[in-house]
Amino acid sequence: MDRKHGTADRIAVYGILALLLLGGIAAFAFSRDFSGTEKRYLAKAPHNFSLADWTLNNDLETYLSDQIPLREQLVGLDSRLQVWTGRATQLETWPTGDAIVEPPVQADLKTLTDRTARMREVAGDIPCRFLVPPTAGMLRMNEMTAVRRAVYEEEAEVYAGLTGQEGFIPLLDAFAASEEPVFYLTDHHWNDNGVRLAYEAFCSAAGPEPAGMEAFTRTEYSPFTGTTQARAGLPAARADTLVCMEPAFPVTFEVKETGETYDHLTFPEKAATCDGYEVFLDGNHGLLTVRNPGAAGRLLVFRDSFASSLIPYLSANYGEITAVDVRYYAGTFADALEEAGEPDEILFLYSLDSLANDTSVARKLRRKE
């Protein structure tokens, strides 16, 4: 009897060792560079190591974790177990109703107020406005448990205190009243419905007449799965349609760092990449200029990626738009204002998270010593 148990035990041990060996071989033989589900580059096999710093173990562990066979299925199973057992907040992003939302922004009202006051100081005598969208989680609080709702209520309180100040264009009521979603279900950015509402709110505050839909050519790209879905680790059970509005009037689009000039603002070839949102304005650029010879006025936009889908709309109302993303711009806010010449207006367009937590924004607002 003992001999039979011993044989069975050995078979089990050998079987486990064989599986581990095969898994290790597969990890090296069939390694991948990129995960389409997680939308990130995977670790590469370690080539060099030093006995002085002993990094091989960590590098090898990271590599095997990324390259293990069936990794995406295992990650998806683990994420679903987190949701089914009431631990969804352990995920990097949180399932809520039919959407995936970002966790609430950690923001301090005084810090935000000081930061926007410095932005006004940079603008000087030039009229400036602020456009800060509410978060998707803030709009979906009623779909959450009481515990999760409480942390978004704190976020909403900070947002209300910030956007109630002078120069802020209100968006919350219009977004909350919309019968259609204003954010993508799988991404943290606003969708075209949200962009249009923001455009109309800006025009109402700044004065220009909003351009009609006939001024643009609408193109849809489907399916679109955003980075918020990818970071949840959940299978792509939901998908969005990416909607782009290309001006039907003549425009030029110049990227400063490359010197390249285009006659369009959307880039269809980007729609099928790992970050389909780069279809707007060809992704992230430090400084770009959009010109419309049929319009007048100069607008300077300090922005994050939320502005990428709004600028095509704004191009109908301004002869020249200079857009600066300080994350990719070498200079400060003051440097960008000087480089832009003499704009008639300034728009600061940032998500609440960028405004509160982006270190580039904080650092490049500082006064020079």
Language-model regions: role of each:
Residues 1-369:
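Extracellular glycan-modifying ectodomains
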